[in-house]
């Protein structure tokens, strides 16, 4: 999100034209790797010339969106799932390869370690159908809150002793 915030300081309304107009160095200065700069500029160019239609994705099924987006260099299943959840608002996406979701599941459910993409994580998502995107958001939030609590708890226990 730091990178996103740095880019938004340059322009509030992000567009393919905006990314195409930026120099690679400007994007690098915002924190993007050389490969991500190439991917972003390539995708922006594809959108501008009409070879990649983001608006048209909303008419496709979830799997069709993933297949279509994955044709773009630098976009895979995880990125496609994030687009489905956050841009298209699809309710039943279960991002089993997302580290935040897995950490949230482990913490909230007090489970043993799981690997991202594991069959156990995939199966666990079945109980949340057809609202797995919402469950994923809960696990992300839990994981984010846990980070804050783990930083604050030692300070609280020290102040109680004083």
Where is each model-derived feature located?
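Alpha-helical ds-nucleic-acid-binding substructure associated with the helix-hairpin-helix region
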Residues: 1-71
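C-terminal accessory module of base-excision DNA glycosylases/AP lyases that mediates lesion recognition
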Residues: 62, 77-162
């Amino acid at each position: 999100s730091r990178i996103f915030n740095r880019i938004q300081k340059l322009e509030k309304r992000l567009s393919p034209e905006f990314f195409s107009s930026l120099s690679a160095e400007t994007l690098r200065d915002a924190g993007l790797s050389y490969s991500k700069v190439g991917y972003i500029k390539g995708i922006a160019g594809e959108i501008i010339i009409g070879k990649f239609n983001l608006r048209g994705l909303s008419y496709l099924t979830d799997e069709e969106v993933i297949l279509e987006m994955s044709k773009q260099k630098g976009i895979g299943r995880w990125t496609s799932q994030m687009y489905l959840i956050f841009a298209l608002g699809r309710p039943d996406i279960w991002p089993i390869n997302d580290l935040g979701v897995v950490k949230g599941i482990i913490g909230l459910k007090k489970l043993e370690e799981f690997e991202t993409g594991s069959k156990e994580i995939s199966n666990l998502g079945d109980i949340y159908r057809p609202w797995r995107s919402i469950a994923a958001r809960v696990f992300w939030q839990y994981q984010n809150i846990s980070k804050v609590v783990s930083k604050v708890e030692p300070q609280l226990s020290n102040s109680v002793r004083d």
